[in-house]
Design a protein with these regions (language model features):
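Amphipathic alpha-helical repeat scaffolds of TPR domains
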Residues: 176-187
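Nucleotide-sugar donor-binding/catalytic module of glycosyltransferases
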Residues: 1-157, 161-169, 261, 267-268
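Secondary-structure edge/capping motif, primarily at the C-terminal ends of alpha-helices
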Residues: 162-166, 187-194
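Generic structural signal for well-ordered, non-membrane alpha-helices
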Residues: 154-161, 182, 255, 272, ...
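Short, contiguous, well-ordered secondary-structure segments
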Residues: 82-85, 90-91, 185, 203, ...
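Membrane-interface aromatic/basic loop that binds lipid-linked glycans or pyrophosphate carriers
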Residues: 192-290
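All-alpha amphipathic helical-bundle segments outside canonical DNA-binding/catalytic cores
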Residues: 168-177
């Protein structure tokens, strides 16, 4: 036995309850979360500890995948496997994983952490091995559209409560908009096999929340992805579909105009970017029926 290791037991009340129990009983300087299906490299914790101590950070982003995914100042949320957290930070800010919420309990928790700190470090050397299989959470979640759709307003209600209590609506408006783009829009509306009526309901949920809480200036930010900007400009679900189709045609026209660009490297880069945008738009139109 190792005296540094403690085993805690409780009735199965979900992953949030288990993580919160662990946080309340932890005594070290840092918190790290590893799911039961996964495993970590031998040097995983050492890399994270060194990076966190060097940066005196509240949160360290773990792994190259997550370090590369977002610009340093524009991370809307992270999965628990991408989080290495100074233990005192959630304690002094009264932060816990939201219980009774699944999926997105980790997204909400990390979003709240990121909203409250600028002291973030990055550790691409930390290697986390994530197992994917048919019975895994990710695959099961994609099949449960009827359960997840009514869960999304609960996410937004928790966000409203958090931003209201901490007076963050103005100061962290951009952070909030990027979360809405990432979680309910990209990961749910665009990626999950909702039925057409469910897609229209989710579209309305997203638009109503943004109209209520986010300024037009934040919603026009160029850093937002094109499909999300099209949603923000649309007047309804059908109009969103028309804008997607029009954007796909426009990328084809722009690609032809690049033929007249005199700089070969600009021409190649422009074509690659337009190809990527067009493929993304085509995939969205295949997934969503307007």
């Amino acid at each position: 036995e190792d005296s540094r290791i403690r085993c805690l037991e409780q009735e199965n009340r979900g992953v949030s309850s288990a993580r919160n129990l662990g946080m309340r009983h932890a005594s070290g300087r840092y918190l790290c979360f590893v799911d039961g299906d996964d495993f970590i490299d031998a040097a995983f914790l050492k890399h994270l500890l060194d990076a966190s101590d060097r940066g005196a950070s509240d949160l360290t982003v773990a792994g190259k995948l997550f370090c590369d995914r977002f610009p340093p100042d524009k991370i809307p949320a992270l999965p628990t496997c991408g989080i290495f957290l100074r233990r005192e930070f959630p304690l002094k800010n009264n932060l816990e994983f939201p219980e009774g919420i699944h999926p997105c309990e980790d997204g909400l928790f990390s979003h709240f952490v990121l909203a409250l700190t600028e002291k973030i470090s990055f550790c691409p050397e930390a290697v986390y091995h994530y197992r994917q299989h048919e019975q895994g959470n990710h695959h099961q979640i994609r099949k449960r559209t009827a359960d997840i759709l009514p869960m999304i307003p609960r996410w937004l209600s928790l966000i409203e409560e958090f931003y209201e209590q901490r007076h963050l609506w103005k100061r962290k408006a951009g952070h909030l908009v990027r979360f809405i783009e990432h979680e309910p829009f990209e990961l749910r509306l665009l990626d999950m096999p909702f039925s057409p009526p469910e897609q229209e309901i989710l579209y309305s949920i997203i638009r109503d929340f943004l109209n209520a809480h986010c300024t037009a200036a934040e919603c026009r930010r160029a850093s937002l992805h094109l499909p999300f900007r099209l949603l923000l400009k649309s007047s309804g679900f059908s109009d969103f579909g028309r804008r997607l189709r029009r954007a796909g045609k426009n990328t084809g026209i722009r690609r032809k105009l690049l033929h007249f660009c005199p700089v070969p490297s600009w021409r190649r880069n422009g074509r690659a970017q337009l190809r990527q945008v067009r493929e993304q738009l085509e995939e969205i139109r295949r997934n969503i029926t307007f």
